Amino acid sequence: MSHEEYKSAEEKLVYMANQIAGFFQVMGHEAAVDGIADHINKFWEPRMRSHLFEIIGRGGEGFNPLVLEAAAKVKRPKEASV
């Protein structure tokens, strides 16, 4: 899927996460998992991280397995006060 072919924000987020995984996967398994989580923690705003966890909660379809593993090390955003 090229970056021009997104059908939804969800597909774009999956695409972006998989691009990050593609970059880090050459570093070996553990370094890749840590690198993916570190990148998402540093550069993704809380709303994007929340969306990541929503997609994973529904099965995580389309994610590189490294992204799914790295999610355990990604900071969960705090719930908004109502």
Where are these regions (language model features)?
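General marker for long, soluble alpha-helical cores
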Residues: H3-E30, E54, L68-A70, S81-V82
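Amphipathic, hydrophobic secondary-structure cores in small proteins
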Residues: A21-P65
